[in-house]
């Protein structure tokens, strides 16, 4: 079974979301997703200050098997991208919940609370991937 940390929230699209501040979150793809993708060879991320809309594509992860879209877990502004992925995209495979993070997003805390409440907790995500 894939690693599913209890302290994160999860989307149906196999992304994790971690609150990092009152109005910020860090986003990445799950261990389940990186295992399904295989060896990641390229990650396309948005620019800092880009406006993302919940449910819409904001980038791509390319592996030796396929290209998969990344979907925004909430409507927010990009405040940081993981520049290490440009030269080391395999970090998504080796450390999906740590060094392989994708973007940091900022939204007002009320909309952030509402968006996070709609995501899976670890147990809910475990059920989602088991289906």
UniProtKB/Swiss-Prot annotation:
Q: Please give the NCBIfam families that the UniProt record associates with this protein.
A: gcvH, PRK01202.1
User: Subunit notes for this chain?
Assistant: The glycine cleavage system is composed of four proteins: P, T, L and H.
The UniProt note on the cofactor reads as follows: Binds 1 lipoyl cofactor covalently.
Q: Which InterPro entries match?
A: Biotin_lipoyl, GCV_H, GCV_H/Fam206, GCV_H_sub, Single_hybrid_motif
BP terms from Gene Ontology: glycine decarboxylation via glycine cleavage system
Q: From the Swiss-Prot or TrEMBL record, give the protein name.
A: Glycine cleavage system H protein
Give the gene symbol: gcvH
Q: Which cofactor does it need?
A: (R)-lipoate
**Could you confirm whether the keyword Nucleotidyltransferase appears in this record?**
no
- Please give the GO cellular component terms listed in this UniProt entry: cytosol; glycine cleavage complex
User: Which superkingdom?
Assistant: Bacteria
Q: Would you indicate the residue range of the signal peptide?
A: none
Q: Which residues form the Lipoyl-binding domain?
A: 24-106
Q: Which residues carry this modification: N6-lipoyllysine?
A: 65
Q: Which family does it belong to?
A: Belongs to the GcvH family.
Keyword list, A-Z: Lipoyl
What SUPFAM superfamilies does the record point to? Answer: Single hybrid motif
Q: Where are the transmembrane segments?
A: none
What this chain does, per the entry, is described as: The glycine cleavage system catalyzes the degradation of glycine. The H protein shuttles the methylamine group of glycine from the P protein to the T protein.
């Amino acid at each position: 079974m894939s690693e599913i940390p209890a302290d994160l929230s999860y989307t149906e699209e196999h992304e994790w979301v971690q609150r990092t501040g009152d109005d910020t979150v860090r986003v990445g793809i799950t261990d389940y997703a990186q295992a399904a993708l295989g060896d990641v060879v390229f990650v396309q991320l948005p620019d800092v200050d880009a406006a993302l809309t919940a449910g819409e594509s904001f980038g791509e992860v390319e592996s030796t098997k396929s290209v998969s879209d990344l979907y925004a877990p909430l409507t927010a502004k990009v405040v940081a991208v993981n520049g290490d992925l440009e030269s080391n995209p395999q970090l998504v495979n080796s450390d999906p919940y740590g060094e392989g993070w994708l973007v940091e997003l900022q939204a007002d805390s009320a909309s952030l609370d509402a968006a996070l409440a709609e995501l899976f907790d670890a147990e809910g995500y475990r059920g989602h991937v088991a289906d």
